[in-house]
């Protein structure tokens, strides 16, 4: 699994010009499910997201987790994270998991995060839809994480 984890002041996702989800301070996560991902990757990614200290506390930077600040998460599926562009100009998506299997793992990540933070703290995009994602990146702080590395 690959994730782009962005610390945001706010973020939203729209489909057909209608906002379907929005959050305030927290993370906007673009999540790509790879063809070789398993439930173990769900656990590894979820644990990493929950343990990351990307927020400041009163005394020092990089000391607080998403739970510490009572932040929210907007999790958006993005199969293009596994695209290869080494040969030619057209992206190769063969390393991305197919929709029916990928949605199960994506939903497991959302569920796992919700169980830890509270389901009201987790919002998501529409799996497989063409979406517009808007965000105010705070810092900017953007972390790339791959469960296979």
From Swiss-Prot:
The gene is dtd1. Keywords: Cytoplasm, Hydrolase, RNA-binding, tRNA-binding. Disulfide bonds: none annotated. It is an enzyme of class 3 (hydrolase). GO terms for cellular component: cytoplasm; cytosol; nucleus. Belongs to the DTD family. A motif (Gly-cisPro motif, important for rejection of L-amino acids) lies at residues 139-140. Its EC number is 3.1.1.96. Homodimer. PANTHER family: D-AMINOACYL-TRNA DEACYLASE 1, D-TYROSYL-TRNA TYR DEACYLASE. One of its GO terms (biological process) is cytoplasmic translation. It is found in: Cytoplasm. GO terms for molecular function: D-tyrosyl-tRNA(Tyr) deacylase activity; tRNA binding. Its main location: cytoplasm. This is D-aminoacyl-tRNA deacylase.
